[in-house]
A protein has these predicted regions:
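Glycine-enriched alpha-helix->loop->beta-strand junction motifs that scaffold or abut catalytic
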Residues: 36-37, 69-73, 104-106, 125-134, ...
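Charged helix-capping and loop-helix junction motifs
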Residues: 57-61, 90-97, 146-152, 175-181
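Active-site beta-loop-alpha junctions enriched in small/polar residues
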Residues: 21, 45-51, 80-82, 115-117, ...
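Eukaryote-skewed repeat-based solenoidal scaffolds used as protein-protein interaction platforms
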Residues: 61, 65-72, 76-111, 115-127
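Histidine/lysine/aspartate-rich catalytic loop segments that bind and position anionic ligands
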Residues: 117-146
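Structured C-terminal cap/extension of enzyme domains
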Residues: 1-17, 33, 149-164, 168-240
């Protein structure tokens, strides 16, 4: 895993988002930072106990404090926790400000992990202390709770930068298709988050993304084929 993170850091992709309390992830990040001499920005998305009790609040405070101890710059309550606070009737997220305050108290930047698109809308409408939001967004509408056009509109109307996730719809479309769609349809301030298993996948995703942003074709190998004359698959052609 350290090899994977090293590829990203060497290419200037210096932020990681997820549930970062797993020891092997923290160890791999430290190894990659040591090898490259570069620092990774940590965006932690911890599960919080959001029950309305004194014991639960104490537990949530401890979880948020642990995020700081891990070295996180950003702390976004996990969507499975944040969505428990949603009141669609009132258009609010009850008690969310309590947890955002806890995050600020620890010197971290608060945000929201949002699978429900309403979280972005309610956050903006109520002026919650949220600096960014995570939102599922891909060309297939995979796991998105409303149509693609609706999420696109929410992203463009959002008051803060949106961190989009699942651009390849969990492997249901190719990186070329998924990443080009995402980069072409979000704002300059927004982000695309990718999940990778190998350093080779990281290299490919970075090249496709840079090509999309620079409006050029990506420098990728063609598909392999036992027939060396299959020009359409190899990506090679001869000028006449």
């Amino acid at each position: 895993m350290a090899d994977l993170f090293e590829v990203f850091l060497n290419q200037g992709v210096d932020a990681i988002m997820g549930i970062l309390s797993q020891p092997h992830i923290c160890e791999a990040i430290s190894m990659a930072e040591e090898r490259t001499g570069r620092k990774m920005i940590l965006i932690n998305t911890p599960w919080l106990n959001v029950d309305d009790t004194a014991a639960a609040r104490k537990e949530a405070e401890a979880t948020i404090r642990h995020s700081k101890e891990l070295g996180a710059t950003f702390c976004f309550p996990h969507h499975s926790s944040a969505e428990q606070l949603v009141n669609k009737n009132k258009g609010t997220m009850d008690r969310l400000p309590d947890y955002l305050y806890m995050i600020r108290e620890q010197g971290m930047i608060p945000g929201l992990s949002a699978h429900m698109p309403e979280l972005i809308v309610y956050s903006d409408q109520n002026g919650y202390d949220v600096e960014s939001y995570i939102q599922i967004y891909n060309c297939l509408g995979f796991l998105m709770q409303v149509e693609i056009e609706g999420i696109h509109r929410i992203i463009w109307n959002a008051k803060k930068p949106v961190m989009t996730i699942k651009p390849m719809a969990a492997g249901r479309c190719t990186p070329f298709v998924g990443l080009n769609f995402s980069w072409a349809t979000i704002r300059p301030c927004d982000m695309v988050t990718v999940g990778c298993l190998t350093p080779e996948e990281a290299v490919e995703d970075i090249e496709i993304s840079l090509a999309a942003l620079e409006r050029r074709p990506p420098n990728l190998e063609g598909r392999s084929s036992p027939n060396t004359k299959t020009a359409a698959l190899s990506g090679k052609h001869q000028a006449h």
